[in-house]
């Protein structure tokens, strides 16, 4: 049985960030069911990842989201320090000395009801993209920025795939043309610093894992 996240995070600042993420997810799930979590936090909290993620990526297609979110956040003691709507929408939420970034995208997505693991080990049900859809997003993310973390997330998500036919073609094309990670975007040492449990795989081992999964 896995230990609670609070027992294994390496730094106090990480724990405070993770706790704030939990509070924000509580706010989101209380104000709307027209949402779907995605990105690294979805992989970490819903699909048993072991990579610390510092922000929240979420699809939101609810009306009056801004007003509802600001009001609900204030009600639980969270300070919305920035809410930018021009270009790429993002929100900054702060509590005490900890601040996180939320990137809500106004797009309706099919989502699964899944348990989200909180810092203390308890779980709440939320709506999240399927592992197959997350893999397709992560393939695009890796091709765009070539960060170790995206490749790692793919290997984690493959353990939860229920419909292999949805991703096999994309994965075959991906590994056939894959380029090595860009150390200027995320160095291997930076990648190692955010993996808090288990072996930190090399680029070669992660590609090997994906190829083996397809056999």
What are the roles of these predicted feature ranges?
Residues 1-35, 48-56, 61-62, 66-215:
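Structured mid-to-C-terminal alpha-helical surface segments
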Residues 37-42:
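Glycine-rich beta-strand-to-loop/alpha-helix junction loops that act as flexible
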């Amino acid at each position: 049985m896995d230990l609670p996240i609070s027992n294994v995070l390496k730094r106090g600042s990480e724990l405070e960030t993770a706790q704030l993420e939990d509070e924000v997810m509580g706010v989101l799930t209380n104000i709307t069911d027209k949402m779907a979590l995605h990105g690294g936090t979805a992989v970490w909290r819903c699909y048993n990842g072991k990579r610390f993620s510092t922000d929240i990526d979420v699809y939101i297609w609810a009306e009056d989201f801004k007003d509802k979110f600001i009001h609900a956040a204030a009600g639980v003691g969270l300070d919305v320090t920035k809410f930018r709507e021009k270009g790429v929408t993002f929100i900054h939420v702060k509590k005490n000395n900890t601040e996180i970034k939320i990137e809500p995208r106004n797009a309706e997505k099919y989502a699964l009801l899944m348990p989200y693991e909180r810092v203390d080990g308890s779980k709440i049900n939320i709506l999240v993209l399927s592992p197959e859809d997350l893999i397709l997003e992560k393939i695009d993310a890796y091709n765009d920025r070539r960060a170790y973390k995206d490749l790692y997330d793919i290997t984690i998500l493959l353990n939860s795939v229920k419909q292999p036919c949805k991703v096999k073609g994309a994965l075959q094309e991906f590994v056939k043309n894959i380029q090595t990670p860009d150390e200027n975007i995320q160095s291997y040492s930076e990648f190692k610093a955010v993996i808090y449990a288990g072996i930190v795989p090399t680029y070669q081992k992660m590609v090997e894992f994906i190829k083996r999964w397809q056999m």
